[in-house]
Amino acid sequence: MKSKGSRLSTDCPVEFPKIVSGFAEEVKIRRQSSQGQYAVDSHPPKSPELKHRRQRSSSFVNGKCRNRDLPLLDNKKAQEINTNSHGQDIGIKNLPRQRELLNAKNGIDFTLMVAGQSGLGKTTFINSLFSTSLIDDDIKENKPIIRYKSIVEGDGTHLNFNVIDTPGFGNNMDNAFTWRTMVNYIDEEIRSYIFQEEQPDRTKMVDNRVHCCLYFLRPSNKGIDTLDVVTMKKLAKRVNLIPVIAKSDLLTKEELKNFKTQVREIIRVQDIPVCFFFGDEVLNATQDIFQKYPFSIIASNEYIFNEKGEKVKGRQYKWGAVDIENEKYCDFKILQKTIFDWNLIDLVESTEDYYEKCRSEMLRTRLLKARDCLTTKSVDITEEQRKFLEEEMNFDEIEENKLKNYKCYEIINKTVMDKVATEWDPEFITRQLEAKKKFNELSNREISKFRDWKKSLFMEQENFNQEIEQLNHKLENLQLECQDLEYKLLIGKSSNSHSTDSATLVNVHIKR
């Protein structure tokens, strides 16, 4: 039973081995070059591309970079190493061939992401690339990221091929952070692989790291959309980005030429690196990508008959037919060769180098996060763990801790790092800042209202105080008036009493 969004190795069509013929040739070239590095009668490569591949071949083992800085041996030293003191062949020259056979047996993991706005034929392109219905057109899922798995076999070598599709990209009303879904997926696969390597049993490791991203641009005479520019800038820092012009048959030759010039100029001005992980050595030997981007492509799952009567993949129009594999019409075949025939190993190796940098940075971040546990409560730790961090860890000289660092890695596990990644998420930070801004605006409005109310209350209180003072003043006046009246009343009573006493004395005197 097949799961949705994946394909089994038995589903591979007959055309699949042809697609990976370039990868098989790479294995042969590296096998021959490895023998040539140690063999006395080896012949130097004739082409710069073959020389570049020979120099890089010995560094690729099981999809990983190993011993890339080892110098090549000259014929004299090679002869001395291949034989012992008695001149007998000890068989060391066969080791590179055995290693290449082991590499061919184990195969290689390769993940390709197709990104861009909806309606640009990303699904049709993938199906055209492998001449099979790898992605069903009728699958309508609401997931922003869909992964399709397949195993490509050919010439004794197999390729574990993954396709990452991004349906519905750019269809939201607010596309400010639409790119975050793809960026988070790339970062999450890097983190997942780091934690898989820390497990005791690494035989079940799953490598879904994205090695290359084809970004589809809408054909237009007005340049590139802002959404595409922002998204490519974010992706180019995390994956080998290759811009392509979708549905190039909608433009005339002159319009297509001008649009390519506009795209290259915009990419240069916006500082968007193409295949950012490629080193100088690869850049000097690999010029196909950097001379011909953006690639103009036409995709089709239908077969037509060309002018020679041959059955080819193409599109039939009223005015004629277009063979999508004919370089005269588009760069479909060139792009296919660029990815699989010429630069597959470079894409994988450069991604491996980027992964090593991310791994070192992430391990250092986990150690610093463990140090912060002593001063903050961002991570819940036990007293035993706290005692270990305080007494046995030297956070000033991390390298001196040696194996003790793994104790910190156990404390700062994937759950903690996922939480940290969420806290560092640009959309989360932006939403948080927007929420704080709205809160501050609301708070300022409420504070302003409170100040107005306070001012109004103070004014009313002042009016009340004035009224109270006036009433107190009136009360005092009334009290004074009452006192005057009482005084006058007392004086009046006193005078009346004195008059009465005088009259009584007069009457008594008369009687006598």
Swiss-Prot record:
Residues 31-68 are annotated as: Disordered. Its main location: membrane. Residues 246-249 are annotated as: G4 motif. GTP binds at residues 116-123, 168, 247-255, 315. CDD domains: CDC_Septin. It comes from the Eukaryota. It is a peripheral membrane protein. GO terms for biological process: ascospore formation; cytoskeleton-dependent cytokinesis; protein localization. One of its GO terms (cellular component) is prospore membrane. Septins are GTPases involved in cytokinesis that assemble into filaments and form a ring at the cleavage site. May act by recruiting MYO1 and HOF1, a protein involved in septation, to the site of cleavage. Septins are also involved in cell morphogenesis, bud site selection, chitin deposition, cell cycle regulation, cell compartmentalization and spore wall formation. This is Sporulation-regulated protein 3. It comes from Saccharomyces cerevisiae (strain ATCC 204508 / S288c) (Baker's yeast).
